[in-house]
């Protein structure tokens, strides 16, 4: 279930549903309510399903030998923490886009039970325990800030309360960004979770949405430092065997946010020469998945 949810969220976030400053009214035209209901049912089942679960958990003592729900009372469901977080984001987004969604009350009931002040404080407390400074860095961090951004922009009484409840963990993750990225000398260009461009993209969206100038300035500076001089990326080598990102397109997706339109056009021509002619072909042809039951190979789907 969590693998299918990841695929669903990838589709949603690649569409207008995750475009910064997008209008819910305009976004809704890109998806039917029947499709939205299908995604909603998928996520509702996943975020309330505790097992199977693959925790990224450092145990500091015997007291830390606990199950997912005890460790993460808000985000225990799905295969891992970040999948639970982006499942919650998708459900909030669907509520905003489709206020008459048949599953709307189920979604609100679940969110009311998960996104309590007590649960979110426990999630924040988990982050600050010893030896957990790299927990979910930066994929889970980015998805949590996307959830925080979604709730921040929602004019809804429940949404405002849930947004407030997120604040302890939101502040913790923002502080992690501000502390970590000045120390990361080189970007991570992998096609999976640690991808630096992805981690910066969603965080930049959040920073701009809430007008967090220090975070915005840091991300824009780091993005230019890491990527502004890149040219002729070997995108023909993509995809890697277990990628769910295109490293080249993810980098371009970040730089379109950072550069002016004129700068970006010039940068993209040098970064992906031949793109306007359909080259490299690997970026235009779906990857082949030989075994969808394999949790790594299915990343390609």
Residue ranges of each PLM-predicted region?
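Bacterial N-terminal signal peptides
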Residues: 2-15
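Boundary at the C-terminal end of the N-terminal hydrophobic targeting segment
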Residues: 14-22, 252
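Low-complexity, Ser/Thr/Pro/Gly-enriched N-terminal "stalk/linker" regions
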Residues: 24-76
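Structural helix-adjacent loops and short alpha-helical linkers that scaffold large soluble proteins
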Residues: 26-36, 52, 94-109, 151-170, ...
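Solvent-exposed loop and edge beta-strand segments that line ligand/cofactor-binding
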Residues: 28-33, 68-85, 125-142, 183-196, ...
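HEAT/HEAT-like alpha-solenoid repeats
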Residues: 41-44, 48, 52, 73-77, ...
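Extended ligand-binding groove/face enriched in aromatic
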Residues: 69-73, 85, 92-207
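Long, repeat-rich segments with strong aromatic
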Residues: 208-301
């Amino acid at each position: 279930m969590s693998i299918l949810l990841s695929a669903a969220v990838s589709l949603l976030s690649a569409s207008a549903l995750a475009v910064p400053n997008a209008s819910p009214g305009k976004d809704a035209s890109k998806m039917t309510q029947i499709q939205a209901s299908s995604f909603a049912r998928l996520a509702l089942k996943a975020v309330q399903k505790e097992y199977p679960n693959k925790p990224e958990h450092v145990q500091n003592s015997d007291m830390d030998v606990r199950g997912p729900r005890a460790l993460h009372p808000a985000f225990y469901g799905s295969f891992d923490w970040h999948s639970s977080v982006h499942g919650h984001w998708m459900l909030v987004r669907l509520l905003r886009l489709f206020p008459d969604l048949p599953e709307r009350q189920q979604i609100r009931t679940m969110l009311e039970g998960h996104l309590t002040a007590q649960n979110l404080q426990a999630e924040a407390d988990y982050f600050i325990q010893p030896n957990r400074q790299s927990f979910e860095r930066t994929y889970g961090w980015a998805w949590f800030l996307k959830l925080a951004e979604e709730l921040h922009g929602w004019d809804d009484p429940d949404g405002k309360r849930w947004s407030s409840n997120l604040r302890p963990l939101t502040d913790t993750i923002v502080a992690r960004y501000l502390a970590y990225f000045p120390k990361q000398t080189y970007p991570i260009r992998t096609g999976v979770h640690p991808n630096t461009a992805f981690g910066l993209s969603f965080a930049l969206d959040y920073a701009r949405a809430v007008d967090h100038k220090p975070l915005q300035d840091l991300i824009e500076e780091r993005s230019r430092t890491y990527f502004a001089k890149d040219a002729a990326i070997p995108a023909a080598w993509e995809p890697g065997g277990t990628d769910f990102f295109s490293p080249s397109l993810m980098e371009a997706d970040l730089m379109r946010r950072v550069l002016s339109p004129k700068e970006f056009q010039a940068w993209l021509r040098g970064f992906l020469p031949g793109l306007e002619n359909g080259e490299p072909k690997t970026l235009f042809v779906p990857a082949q998945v030989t075994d969808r039951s394999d949790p790594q190979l299915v990343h390609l789907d």
